[in-house]
């Protein structure tokens, strides 16, 4: 029996390691556009958006002042429930909840990004979060609020918090967010498949071990 059981040992170990690797690989990945070494909230009244009131299914132009110390600008739009909404057009990198635009030239003074608001008419307030990132991966964050009423957008200083409620840190900071309905649906779809594979691996492992 020992002779017959010994060839099965590598297979048992392989299945055990496979189960652990699969479980680790199924965890959610952070938003790659939102990993910074430092985040500071500021009041930047020079950031402009046009049009100045919120309407559904409308293209907005966000103008962000930049200089030769800025490497990129990360844009993010959320509704009053902090769910990511809309679509950032022609971004250099689209991430889980945000979009990244590279500063193409050191002589560039204004970076423009276009955002398409969702078709839903149930949204009254939108926050456009702007992260201006330098070459040290340190970001300054500003929030521009668009309202459906006839009021002008109010650029406000708002603390962009992480899981540990830390704004400024020496370690890489990952900005967390709620996902869209599409991302939620993908996770709901993947969850039964992931559970089924884990159960199958556990079943095969138990059969080989016992």
Swiss-Prot record:
Cellular compartments annotated: Membrane; Apical cell membrane
Instruction: Please provide one cellular component term from the Gene Ontology annotations of this protein.
Output: apical plasma membrane
UniProt keywords (A-Z) are: Cell membrane, Differentiation, Glycoprotein, Membrane, Signal, Transmembrane, Transmembrane helix
| Tissue-wise expression | Highly expressed in placenta.
The record, for Pfam families, names: Reeler
Recorded hits in PANTHER family, A to Z, give:
PLACENTA-EXPRESSED TRANSCRIPT 1 PROTEIN (PTHR22527:SF2)
Gene Ontology BP, a term: cell differentiation
Q: Which segments cross the bilayer? A: 190-209
Q: Which residues lie on this side of the membrane: Extracellular?
A: 27-189
Give the residue range of the signal peptide: 1-26
Glycosylated residues (UniProt) = 67, 94
User: What does the protein in this record do?
Assistant: Modulates leading keratinocyte migration and cellular adhesion to matrix proteins during a wound-healing response and promotes wound repair. May play a role during trichilemmal differentiation of the hair follicle.
Q: What is this protein called?
A: Placenta-expressed transcript 1 protein
Question: Topological domains (Cytoplasmic): residue ranges?
Answer: 210
Recorded name of the encoding gene: PLET1
**Protein's membrane topology:** Single-pass type I membrane protein
């Amino acid at each position: 029996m020992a002779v017959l059981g010994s060839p099965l040992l590598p297979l048992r170990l392989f299945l055990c390691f496979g189960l652990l690797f699969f479980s680790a690989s199924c965890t959610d990945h952070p938003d790659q556009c939102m990993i910074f070494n430092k985040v500071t909230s500021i009041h930047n009244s020079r950031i402009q958006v046009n049009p100045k009131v919120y309407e559904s299914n409308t293209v907005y132009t966000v103008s962000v002042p930049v200089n030769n110390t800025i490497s990129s600008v990360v844009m993010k739009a959320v509704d009053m429930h902090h769910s990511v909404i809309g679509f950032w057009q022609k971004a250099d990198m689209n991430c889980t909840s945000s979009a990244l635009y590279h500063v193409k030239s050191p002589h560039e003074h204004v970076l423009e990004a276009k955002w398409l608001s969702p078709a839903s008419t149930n949204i009254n307030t939108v926050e456009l979060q702007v992260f201006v990132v330098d070459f040290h991966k340190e970001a300054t964050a500003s929030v521009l609020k668009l309202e459906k009423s006839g009021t002008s957008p109010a650029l406000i200083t708002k603390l962009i918090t992480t899981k540990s409620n830390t704004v400024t840190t020496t370690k890489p900071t990952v900005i967390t967010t709620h996902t869209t309905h599409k991302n939620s649906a993908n996770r709901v779809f993947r969850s039964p498949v992931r559970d089924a594979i884990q159960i199958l691996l556990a079943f095969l492992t138990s059969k080989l071990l016992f």
